[in-house]
């Protein structure tokens, strides 16, 4: 089988080497972007008079027919043609004859391939952002629904201070909002056209790079042809943003795993998002959440693999860069799957509000409020901290909690305590008094919910 680049060679490729260098198995998913790029390129060639207008029209029609063949499952993919790009070009020549060979005028696979990847990344950033917004919408819905539910807030995985469940859920909304912004930032670097850079040095033909960039919807063009064909920063940035987003999903998944355990009992997974045991009939395992957590390492690995491929490459193009696609595709596919399944899991999650309320009543998470009570009575905070610490120790030694103490016991620690201490350290008071901006007081959480709803409303148009 004659290679499109075979003029220089005197013998065919070794079959093992041919299979080793082929990227068709994974880059065939770029067919839409490849055809889009080729149509823009051939329109420019015809417009500039570089090839006959009639040939440009025949090539465009042939490319559209090839796209239809691929989508109908009728395209004859051939591994010996190495990749999706040469498969399409070879098929074009078969369909329309020698005129198809004009398509690659003033173009190299170096700028062709990276143009395809730029287009794919732009498409996928938009898809990921939609999924992020969907998950944010579900978090917002559940936070509204659970407004008023009080639970322990944690530091060091120890009960720290009471918070609203809605406040806790909204923390993840804002993490995802930063993720959305990171993807938007990554889009700016992806939204630049390398098409027309050639192999590395540009071309001798009078091409119009601004025309092809506009045809493809790019915001601009690379100003340096060597940078254009060798840049993979935009891939690294996208995958880095994906890794950070996946880290947030992993943190949420970890909390759901813990909260669904008997030891916490704060939530129950819907049966559709849990599995059983092959030996223990009683088990209901949070496998979906565990897999979201586990797949985080996979995306981190994709990011590290990309950085390692790039770290020692001199300018300009090297076939090492073929290794970028599988890592990119895997990271994006994994993130999209995790965002989708997490949205469904959260939408169907059952919250045990009573169990959360019981937990917050039988702990010392109101100790800070007891100290604040003394400070408001005029005691310096450090002294109040010491007094409350001793009261906590007293309770621990006697199997009590602060709310169990009699007024006489309170007064043994400080004469400033009055009967209003019981109201001051009630969980509902602890929550409602935290009215600082961004705090867990109901009014502040309602403000968060309104702001979040406004953000999503603007985004959804």
UniProtKB/Swiss-Prot annotation:
It comes from the Bacteria. PANTHER family: ARGININOSUCCINATE LYASE. Pathway: Amino-acid biosynthesis; L-arginine biosynthesis; L-arginine from L-ornithine and carbamoyl phosphate: step 3/3. GO terms for cellular component: cytosol. One of its GO terms (biological process) is arginine biosynthetic process via ornithine. Its EC number is 4.3.2.1. It is found in: Cytoplasm. It catalyses: 2-(N(omega)-L-arginino)succinate = fumarate + L-arginine. This is Argininosuccinate lyase. One of its GO terms (molecular function) is argininosuccinate lyase activity. It is an enzyme of class 4 (lyase). Keywords: Amino-acid biosynthesis, Arginine biosynthesis, Cytoplasm, Lyase. Belongs to the lyase 1 family. Argininosuccinate lyase subfamily. It comes from Symbiobacterium thermophilum (strain DSM 24528 / JCM 14929 / IAM 14863 / T). The gene is argH. PROSITE patterns: FUMARATE_LYASES. CDD domains: Argininosuccinate_lyase (cd01359).
């Amino acid at each position: 089988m004659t290679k499109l680049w075979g003029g220089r060679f005197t013998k065919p490729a070794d079959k093992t080497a041919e299979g080793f260098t082929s990227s068709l198995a994974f880059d065939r998913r770029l067919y839409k972007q490849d055809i889009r790029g080729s149509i823009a390129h051939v329109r420019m060639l015809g417009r500039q008079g570089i090839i006959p207008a009639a040939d440009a029209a025949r090539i465009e029609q042939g490319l559209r027919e090839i796209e239809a063949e691929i989508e109908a499952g009728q395209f004859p993919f051939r591994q010996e043609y190495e990749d999706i790009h040469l498969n399409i070009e070879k098929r074009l020549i078969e369909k329309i004859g020698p005129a198809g060979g004009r398509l690659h005028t003033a173009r190299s696979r170096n700028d062709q391939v990276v143009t395809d990847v730029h287009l794919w990344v732009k498409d996928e950033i938009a898809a990921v952002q939609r999924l992020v917004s969907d998950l944010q919408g579900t978090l917002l819905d559940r936070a509204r629904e659970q407004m008023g539910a009080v639970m322990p807030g944690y530091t060091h995985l120890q009960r720290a201070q009471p918070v609203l469940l809605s406040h806790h859920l909204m923390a993840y909304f804002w993490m995802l909002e930063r993720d959305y912004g990171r993807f938007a930032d990554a889009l700016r670097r992806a939204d630049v056209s390398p098409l027309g850079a050639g192999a590395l040095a540009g071309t001798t033909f009078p091409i119009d790079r601004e025309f092809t960039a506009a045809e493809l919807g790019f915001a601009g063009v690379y100003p340096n042809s060597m940078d254009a064909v060798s840049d993979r920063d935009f891939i690294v940035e996208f995958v880095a943003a994906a890794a950070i987003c996946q880290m947030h999903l992993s943190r949420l998944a970890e909390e759901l795993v813990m909260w669904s355990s008997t030891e916490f009992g704060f939530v129950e997974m819907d049966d559709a998002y849990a599995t059983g045991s092959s030996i223990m009939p009683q088990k209901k395992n949070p496998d979906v959440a565990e897999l979201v957590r586990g797949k985080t390492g996979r995306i981190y690995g994709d990011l590290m693999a990309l950085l390692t491929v790039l770290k020692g490459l001199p300018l300009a193009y090297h076939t090492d860069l073929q290794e970028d696609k599988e890592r990119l595709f895997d990271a994006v596919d994994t993130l999209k799957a995790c965002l989708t399944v997490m949205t469904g899991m959260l939408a169907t999650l059952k919250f045990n509000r009573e169990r959360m309320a019981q937990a917050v009543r039988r702990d010392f998470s109101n100790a800070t409020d007891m100290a604040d009570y003394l400070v408001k009575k005029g005691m310096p905070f450090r002294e109040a901290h010491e007094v409350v610490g001793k009261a906590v120790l007293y309770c621990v030694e006697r199997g009590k909690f602060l709310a169990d103490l009699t007024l006489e016991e309170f007064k043994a620690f400080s004469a400033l305590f009055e009967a209003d201490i019981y109201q001051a350290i009630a969980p509902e008071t602890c929550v409602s008094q935290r009215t600082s901006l961004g705090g867990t007081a109901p009014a502040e959480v309602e403000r968060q919910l309104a702001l979040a709803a406004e953000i999503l409303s603007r985004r959804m148009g």
